[in-house]
Amino acid sequence: MKIEEVKSTVKTQRIAAHSHVKGLGLDENGVPLQMAAGLVGQKDAREAAGIVVDLIKSKKMSGRALLLAGPPGTGKTAIALAIAQELGNKVPFCPMVGSEVFSSEIKKTEVLMENFRRSIGLRIRETKEVYEGEVTELTPVETENPMGGYGKTISNVVIGLKTAKGTKQLKLDPSIYESLQKEKVEVGDVIYIEANSGAVKRQGRSDTFATEFDLETEEYVPLPKGDVHKKKEVVQDVTLHDLDVANARPQGGQDVLSMVGQIMKPKKTEITDKLRMEINKVVNKYIDQGIAELVPGVLFIDEVHMLDLECFTYLHKSLESAIAPIVIFATNRGRCVIRGTDDIISPHGIPLDLLDRLLIVRTAPYNLSEIEQIIKLRAQTEGLSVEDSAIQALSEIGDNTTLRYAVQLLTPAHQNCKVNGRTQITKDDIVEVNGLFLDAKRSAKFLQEENTKYMM
């Protein structure tokens, strides 16, 4: 006898740098807690982000921009991701890095516009009318062929549908008769017909016929409940970029050339402004009719100092357009030269006229106790058992070097502790791995001391 254990099929995800961030960690009054939802400290920045989330939810923030500025390792990206978590899945959130705009295939401004359109959602509400039930009658009505001759054409189809609540007789278009034939619909089948599109779907055979045959490959379904005619509201969330792509890529024909074109990987094409304007017209028409509503999302541009002067000029125009998302920038630069210029120095590497339009949120470096809390949180997220003395040693390393370096030492220290036959990371493991790996400051010091031995 063979007995096998059923293994769990729970989806495991890689633990990333910000896996522990679950939200902004604010109370019901919008006041930040010292340690909540995976964030520690940065109370002012989190409170400001909470106000931004409220503005986004009330749709009063679109077309405005926010800048998260602070030294490296102070939680700028974590706050941006926490904003995304707070907004939920229904609001589009599009993260990108400043260097992504440089491509050999398409223009920088095109990449920016593409991400702008990805950050703007459209919620389409559609009322679908559906006829559902068991087929009690299926009669095609024939008429004389209008073209003459002896052939007959089908003018309409009379179909009877039955549910637990009642029956209805419908007169259908001849085009639906073809769909009924394709689905191989017979009397006794349970089907549904969409009134708007005329789509027919056979769900299976009614379970009242289950005893009809001994050998049967049919799937038997119960008689539908409720009325034959049902109205159902379907809500669909799409982004403007989805609409652009759907209309920019026409479907190929049946000839050999179109098949070859589909097999060969096409070069990335630019979506024209004309097409976008046409889509905007259709979207505005839908909004006026009340069919759709616009959902301004968030475009997060990390390392914004990597953009050049052309991109910043384009951002000006885009932020002032009628359909614009909320843009969040993040940078760790102080005063530096604006990319694309020779000698124009500006705060954060952003032109002054754009800086003037931004709300700036500052993130401050963490103190020793906050670093300790973050390291505890990361150890918990990675499922590691760490002694208090080891956490204290790591906190001191993080205070002297960087928080990222201290967090990165956790996994090598765990490996070292496993090799030594322990289950808990001790201070000795931390000291040992700190001696094996260098941080940026110590590495720079070695370079300075042994400058002559390296190639220039």
From Swiss-Prot:
ATP binds at residues 70-77. This is RuvB-like helicase 1. One of its GO terms (biological process) is DNA recombination. Acts as a transcriptional coactivator in Wg signaling. Proposed core component of the chromatin remodeling Ino80 complex which is involved in transcriptional regulation, DNA replication and probably DNA repair. GO terms for molecular function: ATP binding; ATP hydrolysis activity; ATP-dependent activity, acting on DNA; helicase activity; transcription coactivator activity. It is found in: Nucleus. Forms homohexameric rings. May form a dodecamer with rept made of two stacked hexameric rings. Component of the chromatin remodeling Ino80 complex. It catalyses: ATP + H2O = ADP + phosphate + H(+). Coiled coil: none annotated. Its EC number is 3.6.4.12. Keywords: Activator, ATP-binding, Cell cycle, Cell division, Chromatin regulator, DNA damage, DNA recombination, DNA repair, Helicase, Hydrolase, Nucleotide-binding, Nucleus, Transcription, Transcription regulation. The gene is pont. Gene3D superfamilies: 1.10.8.60, P-loop containing nucleotide triphosphate hydrolases (3.40.50.300), RuvB-like helicase, domain II (2.40.50.360). The keyword Hydrolase applies. Pfam families: TIP49 (PF06068), TIP49_C (PF17856). It comes from the Eukaryota. SUPFAM superfamilies: P-loop containing nucleoside triphosphate hydrolases (SSF52540). Belongs to the RuvB family. GO terms for cellular component: nucleus. InterPro entries: AAA+_ATPase (IPR003593), P-loop_NTPase (IPR027417), RuvB-like (IPR027238), RuvB-like_C (IPR041048), RuvBL1/2_DNA/RNA_bd_dom (IPR042487), TIP49_P-loop (IPR010339).
